[in-house]
Amino acid sequence: MSIKRLTKEDLRETTGVLNPVGHTVLAFKDDAVTTTAATALHGVGMAAEDVLVYAGSEALPRLRERVATASGSAGFGYEITLMRRYLALAEAGAGWLIVYTPEDAAAERVTEVATRLGALCAVRYHRLANEDLI
């Protein structure tokens, strides 16, 4: 079964905790480093539609909303823990990438760029689990 490549519109339309299966969520210290990371990902073969870029100011309100509206049962799981972690990073000015990584080879390229550019987090979402890449 193939995994759908998400768009910004897809993500805007989802509610509750973030769970972009087949994608990796990355945070960088600011928007400038995030832009550099997006360029680096394109340089290692990631297509433009595979890399969604979010400025800190774009991500912060949505993360606040997601944390505030997460269901009660989500409050005890790893997903809401990640959302709270993401919110803290966004409040500190982090920029964000959501990268399509359905295959291990793509995740390896993302991990290399994330490590080289000092990503604050890199979490790959699978169907049944999440994986910290750095």
Give the positions of each predicted feature.
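Positively charged, small/polar-rich N-terminal and surface patches that mediate targeting and assembly
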Residues: 1-134
